[in-house]
Amino acid sequence: MGRHWPYEAILSEPYLGVAASCAKQYTARRDKYVPGGQMWVTESGDAGCGGNTWGSTYADVPRTLNELGEFCTVTDGVIFHNTLASSDYGYLKHGTFEPRPNYFAVLLWNRLMGQTAYDSGIAIEEGKHVYCHSRKDGKEGLVYLVINNSWTEETVVELPKEAEVYVLAGKDSLRSRTMTLNGKELKLGENDALPCLCGEKAEGTLQIAPGGCAFIVL
């Protein structure tokens, strides 16, 4: 787990499964000494055994979102990312504080995903990492996070009804330093105003490109 991974492995099941595997290693001890206690991750991201060259690009977003989604299926608690505005994997670019793709991805997670995690009923496999939560806005319904960790194949989602979707992708490639939301670049506006993190209405079939991630609000 604690080792450097090659870029070619970033969408692989072993790589994406590291966070949950680590959490599961400690659940037995937690249950023995502090039954029902929360588990906190005090340093996430590239904090341990780092040196990756893609931490500041969209390529790290599937890992980040998968870590949040899968961690919630093991335990509740808090995940701290190291670091906010220093190093190549900070959420903000050092010196300019320009938001990187992971910043917007985590901001969307916090705006959309509620505190209650549910079993999505869909087994994890290549192209289909699916996580389900209550809605953060308190309304009835559910929010799904779908991560397509295939390098080559689209993931097709059949929407049961009209949904609000937030589809994330790299602007030109996985290693792009700019992320798009429903095809629009996410970048600061005048006076460093945040862009609109707005969803789009969709119904029928939703296609998620290789390496893409989507929040689906139903």
Whereabouts are the PLM-identified features?
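C-terminal non-catalytic regions of proteins with extracellular/luminal or membrane-system context
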Residues: M113, A117-A123, V156, L188, ...
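Flexible loop/turn segments at secondary-structure boundaries
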Residues: M1-H4, D46-G51, S86-G90, T152-E154, ...
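Noncatalytic carbohydrate-binding groove/subsite architecture in carbohydrate-active enzymes
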Residues: M1-A59, V74
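Active-site-proximal beta-strand/loop segments in catalytic clefts of secreted hydrolases
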Residues: M1, T42-G45, H81-A85, V146-S150, ...
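Acidic, Ser/Thr/Pro-rich beta/coil linker or hinge segments at domain junctions
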Residues: L159-I208
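Carbohydrate-binding surface patches
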Residues: E126-K161, V165-S173, P210-V217
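A structural motif corresponding to the C-terminal end of an alpha-helix
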Residues: C22-G37, E70-G77, L112-Q115, G204-P210
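Aromatic/acidic polysaccharide-binding cleft in carbohydrate-active enzymes
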Residues: W40-R135
